Amino acid sequence: MKKFILAIAAAFMAASMASAQDMAQATELYNNGATAISMKNWTEALDCFQKALEMGKTIGADADELVANCKNAIPGVSLEIAKDLIKDAKYDEAAAKLDEVAKIAEEYENAEVAEKAKELVPQMWMQKGVDALKLKDFATAADGFAK
């Protein structure tokens, strides 16, 4: 009977140690994401936050704050990626990313980012039209202005 109780106690200790290790890894990923933001490396930041979010969900209640922080960061970082695509004149990719941003922002209850993403869409198409007009690509300009 004592061996059985010791075995159960050892199992609980191992589980709690594994959970603490997972929490440390998730926190490290989150911190790496924050560092990537400061360097304006949006893609790396998004990757880190998404991984930290997934790890946090598996950890449970101990990671509620981490999960909330990730859900707060992910929509804004995704919006920055879309803005970079617009700056690089990758309008079709940016349009898809902005749709994704709006969905993610609504899912994570970030109305401000969702609104910004929706407001950016017509501005982006207008910019596409202006850029095409400068190149005398009238068909593409008309397409951009029509959207």
Give residue ranges: language-model regions.
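Alpha-helical junction/boundary sensor with strong preference for TPR arrays
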Residues: 56, 105-108
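Bacterial N-terminal signal peptides
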Residues: 7-15
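TPR-repeat structural position
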Residues: 42, 91-92, 138
